[in-house]
Every structure is written in structure tokens, then in C-alpha cells.
Regions:
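Short loop/helix-cap segments at secondary-structure boundaries that form the rim of catalytic
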Residues: 2-8, 80, 94-102
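Glycine-rich NAD(P)-binding loop of Rossmann-like domains
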Residues: 42-75, 84
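Conserved dinucleotide-binding and phosphotransfer motif residues
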Residues: 9, 83, 115
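Rossmann-like adenosine-cofactor binding region
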Residues: 93-173
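Gly/Ala-rich phosphate-binding loop of Rossmann-like dinucleotide-binding domains
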Residues: 77, 81, 165-166
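Conserved S-adenosyl-L-methionine
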Residues: 82-86, 171
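Phosphate/diphosphate ligand-binding glycine-rich loop within oxidoreductases
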Residues: 1-43, 147
Length: 173
């Protein structure tokens, strides 16, 4: 947003403190559960008359990596408390008080990607974040890992994501 032009035209620009955080956070958790437990796959099979006992995997005591520990990322940390996740976070701004209270460990993005069972992205789309989840980064993830992006789609290189799924470099997204 061109703030100078907006100011000259008398247009007020503001950033709201309230976000749709509860809806986004619940969606993030639901997507984690859906992929890990293969809920959609099983539902589709049953509708097609196929009965496969696919248990999927539990989320309990996995490592959750959160890219972007702002309002939504912090809300996710609070929501998943009962899963006993080990929580890693990558963010340019560290809230040490929150991290200590909620047992969040800040780390660099490469450490987060290589150690996390689930990676959940909560970033604004900027010139710096556009395409940040490229082939190199996606291929650092564990083959059984899950990628959740409830931010903007352009943060992930879609061709690279497709390749990582097709080549089974990650479990699901």
C-alpha cells in the first residue's frame, strides 16, 4: 500500500489487531488431523464402496514446526497443547516470554523443516515470503511430514510442492 498517496488523498490505512485467528487455527488443526488420520481418503473410499482400514498416524508427541509465530501461530500453540507436541518456531521477531510460557523453541527455518513432523505456515505474503517454500526447502522435510499452509498460496512454489508429493518427499499437504 502506498501510504504517502493514501495520506494525501485522506484515506486512512490501518492494521486490525483482530484477525480471523480462531477460524484459521481450527482449520489448521483440522487439516493436520485429516492428513495424518487419512480421514478424507477413507471417506472417499467408503463412498466408493471400498473398505480400507487405514489408521493413519497419531499426532500425539510429534514435532510441530510453526513458520510465523504471530497472532495465529501463537493461537495454534495454545490450541494444540493437549497433543504434547514439541514445538519449534521460525519467526523474525522472538517473543521470549511467550516461548518460555508455552515451551516453544525458536530455531532457523532449516532446522524446523528437517526436525518437524508437521509444518504449519502462518505468514503474510510479501516479496520476501513469496515462493519461500521452494523445492530446496520442501525436500528438506521428512518423508512422513505434513505441510499445512493456511496463509497465502503463493508462499509455496506449487510446482515444487506437487513434485515433493509425487516423489513422496512429504506425506501430505
Amino acid at each position: 500500500i502506498d501510504l504517502e498517496t493514501a495520506k494525501k488523498l485522506g484515506i486512512t490505512i490501518s492494521k486490525t489487531k483482530t484477525t480471523p485467528a480462531p477460524a484459521v487455527v481450527e482449520l489448521s488443526l483440522n487439516l493436520m488431523l485429516d492428513i495424518a488420520r487419512k480421514i478424507t481418503n477413507q471417506n472417499n473410499d467408503v463412498k466408493n464402496g471400498v473398505w480400507n482400514k487405514q489408521m493413519g498416524s497419531l499426532l500425539q508427541e510429534k514435532t510441530l514446526g510453526i513458520i510465523g509465530l504471530g497472532t495465529i501461530g501463537k493461537s495454534l500453540v495454545k490450541l494444540v497443547k493437549g497433543f504434547n507436541f514439541r514445538i519449534l518456531a521460525f519467526d523474525l521477531f522472538h517473543d521470549e516470554k511467550f516461548a518460555k510460557e508455552h515451551k516453544v523453541n525458536y530455531c532457523d527455518i532449516d532446522t524446523l523443516l528437517t526436525q518437524s513432523d508437521i509444518v504449519s505456515i502462518h505468514l503474510n505474503l510479501t516479496a520476501e515470503t513469496k515462493g519461500m517454500m521452494n523445492k530446496e526447502r520442501l525436500y528438506k522435510m521428512k518423508p512422513e511430514s505434513i505441510l499445512i499452509n493456511t496463509s497465502r498460496g503463493e508462499i509455496i512454489d506449487e510446482k515444487a510442492l506437487y513434485g515433493s508429493l509425487k516423489e513422496k518427499k512429504i506425506l501430505g499437504a
